[in-house]
Amino acid sequence: MSVDTLSNAMIAIKNAEMVGEKKCEIKPASKLIGNVLKVMKDYGYIKGFEYVENHRGGKFIVELSGNINDCGAIRPRFSSSVTEYEMYEKRYLPARDFGILIVSTTKGVMSQKDARKQRLGGVLLAYVY
């Protein structure tokens, strides 16, 4: 049994993307994973997702679009201020303006681009490109 459900979700998406699958199953489901999937959908990395209750913690069925080259969870979860986002972009993303970092802020889960516009710091959760 795994401890980090977000890492498992990102690995499941990455593996399904690499073998060319159209759908991926993520279990167990959580609100955090749902919010991360919503950000990924907003930026076009996945087509959509659906929550299914199975009386074992639920699961998400994710419809993949084939736009993900790499994705993963960031461990340990670094706290970041607005001025530090660029440092983490250089570390986790391959090029400037290519991909997103997913951040948990006081206003909810969003990309680092939205957090920078709203001048919010937060905790880094994942990267996608």
Curated annotation (Swiss-Prot):
The UniProt GO MF terms for this protein read: rRNA binding; structural constituent of ribosome
Cellular component annotations (GO), alphabetically ordered: ribonucleoprotein complex; ribosome
InterPro entries for the chain: Ribosomal_uS8, Ribosomal_uS8_CS, Ribosomal_uS8_sf
**Pfam families, per this entry?**
Ribosomal_S8 (PF00410)
**Which GO biological-process labels does this protein carry?**
translation
Q: Does the keyword Ribonucleoprotein apply?
A: yes
Keyword Transport in record: no
- Record's keyword terms, sorted: Ribonucleoprotein, Ribosomal protein, RNA-binding, rRNA-binding
Highest taxon of the source?
Archaea
Family membership, please give it. Belongs to the universal ribosomal protein uS8 family.
Subunit comment for this entry?
Part of the 30S ribosomal subunit.
Primary role: One of the primary rRNA binding proteins, it binds directly to 16S rRNA central domain where it helps coordinate assembly of the platform of the 30S subunit.
Its name, as the record gives it, is Small ribosomal subunit protein uS8
Organism from which the protein derives: Archaeoglobus fulgidus (strain ATCC 49558 / DSM 4304 / JCM 9628 / NBRC 100126 / VC-16)
